[in-house]
Design a protein with these regions (language model features):
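Conserved, mostly hydrophobic/aromatic
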Residues: 6, 61, 86, 100, ...
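Active-site catalytic pocket residues across diverse enzymes, especially alpha/beta-hydrolases
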Residues: 90, 129, 148
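C-terminal alpha-helix/helix-terminus motif
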Residues: 141-149
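Glycine-rich phosphate-binding active-site loops on the catalytic face of alpha/beta enzymes
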Residues: 14-22, 62-74, 114-141
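Acidic, divalent-metal-coordinating active-site segment for phosphoryl/phosphodiester hydrolysis
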Residues: 102-114
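Conserved anion-binding
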Residues: 1-5, 9-96
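Expand to "…catalyze enediolate/carbanion chemistry for C-C bond making/breaking, isomerization
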Residues: 22, 26, 104, 149-150
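Short amphipathic alpha-helical surface patches that serve as generic macromolecular interface elements
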Residues: 80-83, 108, 141
């Protein structure tokens, strides 16, 4: 029921956690049937090879670089090897490689170098800002971008 609800709400891409379903391929098929692009997310303990059979079916792979649950966690550096492995497995396929968790000015350049092309930054964007100080958010985003542009 969630896939249809997200699609009806206007989602373009729906990403499901690999570990949240017994049949990831069926979930990907259901997302596509709803008219959306399909993504699959991997928790830190899930090996890259787990999604090899899905590579011709997904538009996005999200590597969780923290354990899901709450914001502000520290980046798990061992996930760089998983990012590199997935980039190699993806090859020339048009699949986004997204990183979610602990993305900040200390980690952004490393994940981009490893092969990521979509970065999800939460706490690093919103630190120090407020409704009264919204310009801080833009400054934080620029600081993250500048780490891998140089």
């Amino acid at each position: 029921p969630y896939i249809a609800a997200y699609a009806e709400a206007g989602a373009d891409i729906i990403t499901a956690h690999y570990e949240a379903t017994h049949h990831p391929h069926r979930t990907v098929q259901a997302i596509r049937a709803a008219g959306c692009k399909a993504g699959i997310a991997l928790n830190p303990s899930t090996p890259a090879e787990s999604v090899e059979y899905l590579l011709d079916s997904v538009d996005l792979i999200c590597v969780m670089t923290v354990n899901p649950g709450f914001g502000g966690q520290s980046f798990i550096w061992s996930q760089l090897q998983k990012i590199e492995k997935l980039k190699s497995m993806i090859g020339s396929r048009p699949i986004y490689l997204e990183i979610d968790g602990g993305v900040d000015t200390e980690t952004a350049a490393s994940v981009v170098k490893a092969g990521a092309n979509v970065l999800v930054a939460g706490s690093a964007v919103f630190k120090g800002g407020s409704v009264d100080e919204p310009l801080v958010y833009g400054e934080n985003i620029s600081a993250i971008r500048n780490t891998f542009k140089n």
